[in-house]
Amino acid sequence: MELLQRTRKINKLLQEHKGIAVDFKEMADYLGSAMQSNVFILSRRGKLLGFGVNELLKNERIIKMLEERQFPETYVELLLNINETKSNIQIENDLSVFPSENADLFAQSNTVIIPIKGGGTRLGTLVLGRVDRAFDDEDLVLGEYAATVVGMEILREKHADIENLARDKAAINMAINSLSYSEKEAIEHIFDELGASEGLLVASKVADRVGITRSVIVNALRKLESAGVIESRSLGMKGTFIKIKKENFLEELSASH
């Protein structure tokens, strides 16, 4: 397959998603097929975002690593020291993606390390591995192009996460500001009582202990639930199950004093 055709297929992956995040597993599978290699797309900290492997499934340590979706910390540290593409790394090198304990099986293997960058920062690493053939210049061009595409997607996801956090913060603050003094006090006592982000609440017990009416607790919970901050479910005589939906709620509640 010519380089132009292979590059166009990566473009097609982007175009078909129409604003939805590109599936890194799909990207890795395509690269593995187009380049006839094992492919690993890693975050900066070594989390496995996507992979396409074949020969490496012969090794138990690799299988466990894929199941945990995390590369070893020592290997990730080595990757972060690589600031530009490093190609055709041999099995004897610590940067080889092939397991050294099976050096006899992978004696002719080659590894390529391609840093994934975006916005002036290191976002991750693209790792390629072949069992018995070196990578040529066309392979490296395609790999570097794929790394650029992955970097753009990681940045897009980061920006989306920031926007979601900002929306959640605004919703939380609006909900907190809608509470009366006694309702806010009731909510603080409720989560002190639970000692966690979810649990079973017996409103009458909290009301008696704190010295407020049960209706204050009920009203406070309704306001938070209508704002999408918590969810609650009545369990009859057992009480009410409460769960925080927006993870920064307790932090914002504490900061609102």
UniProtKB/Swiss-Prot annotation:
The keyword Cytoplasm applies. Keywords: Cytoplasm, DNA-binding, Repressor, Transcription, Transcription regulation. It comes from the Bacteria. InterPro entries: CodY (IPR014154), GAF-like_dom_sf (IPR029016), GTP_trans_reg_CodY_C (IPR013198), Transc_reg_CodY_N (IPR010312), WH-like_DNA-bd_sf (IPR036388), WH_DNA-bd_sf (IPR036390). It holds the Pfam family CodY. GO terms for biological process: negative regulation of DNA-templated transcription. It is found in: Cytoplasm. Its main location: cytoplasm. One of its GO terms (molecular function) is DNA binding. Residues 203-222 bind DNA. One of its GO terms (cellular component) is cytoplasm. Residues 1-155 are annotated as: GAF domain. DNA-binding global transcriptional regulator which is involved in the adaptive response to starvation and acts by directly or indirectly controlling the expression of numerous genes in response to nutrient availability. During rapid exponential growth, CodY is highly active and represses genes whose products allow adaptation to nutrient depletion. Belongs to the CodY family. This is Global transcriptional regulator CodY. It comes from Macrococcus caseolyticus (strain JCSC5402). The lineage of its organism: Bacteria, Bacillati, Bacillota, Bacilli, Bacillales.
